[in-house]
């Protein structure tokens, strides 16, 4: 059973609990992400720090412009908006697409347990539970601090498709590694 990112993180709990912070990186994202820089952006109170960039995307997370605290999400195609508070408006937020690269605190597991329980998700004793990380973040943003870290120099490519591999090869060459 594919658990999606949220379920996979929860399933790996026994390996990650007690480690402080850990990196989650979508396997089909090829990038020049500066992971040391991302680590330096982590605030002590954050349960997650999400690397975002200023680029075109069909979906964006919404952040408080002063703190980069996650306060919502927008589907840029349909116009659907989810906000953490009724008093917020989309025009008072910064919108940035998520890179699929994030650092989580091991304190996230207690929140994930509450999410699974509150949502009534089915848990397979062997395989675990399936849930998308974005859905979890949109629920958790009302309960714990999740911050965005805007990477101005981030270049990324979705290599989950065969036609992207040539672009990835060209990008790798341009990085002069």
Placement of each model-derived feature along the sequence:
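Short beta-strand-to-loop element that shapes/binds the nucleotide-sugar donor at the catalytic cleft/hinge
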Residues: 48-66
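Short phosphate-binding loop-to-helix
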Residues: 1-23, 82-85
